[in-house]
Amino acid sequence: MKRTQLLPQKNLAQTCAKCHSDAGFLSRHQIPVAHPVESYEQSVHGRAIAAGSGQAANCNNCHGNHDIQPAREAESRVNHWRVSQTCAQCHKEIAKTYEESIHGVAVKSGVKDSPVCTDCHGEHLILGPKNPASPVNAANVSAETCGRCHASARMAKLYDLPADRVPSYADSYHGLALKGGKMTAANCASCHGVHNIFRSADARSTVNTANLGKTCGQCHKGADEARYAIGPIHVQTGAGPNHPVVKWIRWTYWVLIPMTLGFMLLHNLLDLLTKLIRRRPRHESSEVALRMNLQFRIAHWGIMASFPTLVVTGFALKYPDSWWARPLLMWESNAGVRGGLHRVAAIVMLLATAYHFIHLAMKKRDRAFVWAMLPGIKDATDMVHVFAYNLGFTKKEPTFAKFNYAEKMEYWAFMWGTVVMALSGFMLWFNNFSLRHFPKWVSDAATAVHWYEALLATFSILIWHFYLVIFDPMVYPMDTAWLNGKIPADHYRHSRPEYFRTLKRAGLVELPSELSGYEDEQGTAVTSGNDPSGKT
């Protein structure tokens, strides 16, 4: 198709605008496209013309001169079946590539729903891919452009297309990171190609099994140089066709999380109601007892600073549209603040945990803490006793040893969770290593574990830990042991009488002013009673 030009380039759009910018004209002739000239002038073509380019497309290059036909007519240059030929006047190689692609072949076969150039790039308002308003901008291509067809239930049913591709991508790390502003995250075109899209079974396809290493290697350096273990790319968040291990992990957590949180809510609600109804005085004296020496408090401070940071920065990836996530993600396109903070917080938590164990290893007297934290038969009977007391089956108030079952459960759950989150987190952090040395389902399993364990840990802290150190009527409004290491002696006098007598004999139950010097001089005298997490 030969390009012709009858009027100076800069004047042609304004000539067409005399009619096509007239609302009355558009209405009378039932022309549905509003503001075509204004849109064109803002496009890459219109701006190039305005800048003096003689090569950019003008109205007549696409619509013709005196042979202009409505788009519905087969002879029209902008008819759906002829669009790629019209664009080929300038974009010859791209048009050739497109016509060989799955979309181009489908158009030639008469599939009217198969996209042509204007379906993806627009018609009059064609913008460059770096323009945030462009439908082929990295932020828009998956959800708005590809998603318009591949997320359509009608299209999926009519052409037997997989209906899960767009939602599974949107819920993946790539989709969530892109939605959160990380423009370097992979989108549909990053993997499937732009104009050169083929069926995955086609050897030319960038997502063909033989080519996946090279495709993924664009971002994951080394993936195309080593044994790249290929697996399903679009991983389901529900009970879809995933690897059996990933399915098993999800089903396990779907049962574990509601059961665990339900138990916590029931336990704390019964305890709260019982204490509110019986209203025993919290403090009968002004005596205080040493709860946490400085070493335990340092470890707790590190965990206390890192855990909320991990929660906020982690959930900001999963819920990038949340109001609380936006201030954090506003820097994501350039600096990657969220991910950086998340990893720093993870290191801080691991260092705090390591500090705790180094402290126990170096302080012989404090090592008794570990033995005191081990669960035993008494913890099970204590739990039964607490439920019986809170339900009114017994009037005898339960008493405990140095640590009660609630503190032991939280301590060991924290240690287990830290190990699980660290292992899964490092696999995701060093994803190139993981993808080179393990099957892809291992990374998918790590993603599932990291997500569900984060949910469990977050709600456990909110429900279990916050009740123990804030909302329990016996400590409300806050257990201050994490600040100064001390708690009211009555906390032990009533609920842990044997341990209270041990503290008393050691001289660690005194008036506040008298106890101030004990932390450094005698703080380890009965450290089997110290609690590194501040969970009281």
Q: Where do the model's predicted regions map?
A:
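Short sequence/structural segments immediately N-terminal
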Residues: 1-291, 324, 329-334, 356-367
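Membrane-embedded alpha-helical bundles that constitute the cytochrome b-like, heme-associated redox core
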Residues: 212-218, 222-536
